[in-house]
Amino acid sequence: MPSCGLDDETLNKTDVLIWWSHIAHAKVPDEIAERVRQRVLDGMGFIVLHSSHLCKPFVKLMGTCCRSKWRENDEKERIWVIEPAHPIARNLPEYIELDQEETYGERFEIPTPDELVFISWFSGGEVFRSGACWRRGLGKIFYFRPGHEAYPTYYRSEIRQILANAVDWAKPSHGPKPTLGQVKTPYEGIRVVDHSDEFHP
């Protein structure tokens, strides 16, 4: 598909981009990844799912390698809601249990999130920061861990609620954009008063 479906016209009309990818991260051209990164800085919301923590745009926006531990062993995941007042946690129970999911484990090499909404525990013993938020420029980013392709995770009503909440949270505010760069004319008039004749040695 030309431009991976992410040409300028499409991105400029996109309020929130949801990204799921696996294995083929390196096949996304660098210029496409940079295009997505710039749109996030300009205000587009970006929701990154599961193994997409290694996709080029997310890695660029985080500035770290974004790697973690993982294991495929059909283990249970319990997703704890640790910020129940956060908009992404709206209408959720205290925790969500997934009978089978891929296990992820700390350390997760990401910058400290601006907000951490979910933490996951796995029956194999690992824990993981599974719902994390950042702001970059004018854009909002949400990483959500569950979603291995071998399991029906995205058919769960609670997971769909999280994704709907995340889209609502990440959408642009469409407020005024800041002026950046040199401003030659001051916003307020500057009056310079010469007091040199008032001082005598």
Where does each model-flagged region fall?
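Extracellular ligand-binding/catalytic regions of CAZymes and related secreted enzymes
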Residues: 128, 136-201
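Catalytic beta-strand/loop cores that center a nucleophilic Ser/Cys/Thr
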Residues: 12, 60, 68-143, 194-200
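A short, well-structured beta->alpha microelement
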Residues: 1-8
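Short acidic/histidine-rich motifs immediately flanking catalytic phosphotransfer sites
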Residues: 10-18
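Short amphipathic alpha-helical segments and helix-helix/interface helices
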Residues: 33-37, 131, 163
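Solvent-exposed loop/turn segments at secondary-structure junctions
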Residues: 4, 23-26, 52-56, 95, ...
